[in-house]
Amino acid sequence: MALPEFSMRQLLEAGVHYGHQTARWNPKMAEFIYGDRNGIHIVDLTQTVPMLDQALKVVRDTVAKGGRILFVGTKRQAQKPIAEAAEKCAQHYMNHRWLGGTLTNWKTVSQSIQRLKQLDEVLATGAEGLTKKERLNMEREQQKLQASLGGIREMGGTPDLLFIIDVGKEDLAIAEAQKLGIPVVAVVDTNNSPKGVDYVIPGNDDAARAIALYCDLVSRAALDGMSAQMGAAGIDLGALDVAPEEETLEA
């Protein structure tokens, strides 16, 4: 596998260049704006292309070193593509409301994950002894925890990189990542500030096609990193293919 390729045409067709209404702009994004058309800011894709490419390299390299990536997108149109992209590359996601302390208070979050796993087990195997009301309460608790934590239940610790759609909506996630020194890759639209984002992808963060394109590219970059990691492991294992000869004891 190789780093996923994309073209300027693909970005245009997905509407990546369409920003927000000029009245809603954030001056901190001025350097990434090409101009405006009919009251809408147009993102300078000649900058987006190399910056997206750099972001994909960071994703690939993080996974190649055995790192964990957390995909974050809680707005309605991002929820499904974020979850699908993370699952496709065996990474982790948060696509409902960001839970305060997900990163900075991982110990408490991991206790909630343990509770979710416990509920799964009880409801799958040993629910016979429960009353109808007890079972119903457990199922409700399970559904609530699954919606909040299902995408990070196998993360096993804080991630090594965040990939975010819509930095305005996910400002809490960025603040927590900054506090812990976790790098952030994010799509930043013309109405938001790139502050706190280590690898900015200037572009539309609302159009379904644009979101699907970002998610697909990041997922494929992670898969490329996984392939590189497995290849490296294969080389190490290959050196151990020949079993050491056993010394025979003389009678």
From Swiss-Prot:
Superkingdom assignment: Bacteria
Gene3D superfamilies referenced in this protein's UniProt entry, alphabetically: Glucose-6-phosphate isomerase like protein, domain 1, Helix hairpin bin
GO molecular function: structural constituent of ribosome
InterPro entries registered for this protein in UniProt: Ribosomal_uS2, Ribosomal_uS2_bac/mit/plastid, Ribosomal_uS2_CS, Ribosomal_uS2_flav_dom_sf
Keywords associated with the record: Ribonucleoprotein, Ribosomal protein
Any GO CC annotation of this UniProt entry: cytosolic small ribosomal subunit
BP GO terms, sorted: translation
Family statement: Belongs to the universal ribosomal protein uS2 family.
PANTHER family: 30S RIBOSOMAL PROTEIN S2 PROKARYOTIC AND ORGANELLAR, SMALL RIBOSOMAL SUBUNIT PROTEIN US2M
Protein name in UniProt: Small ribosomal subunit protein uS2
Organism encoding this protein: Cereibacter sphaeroides (strain ATCC 17029 / ATH 2.4.9)
Primary gene name: rpsB
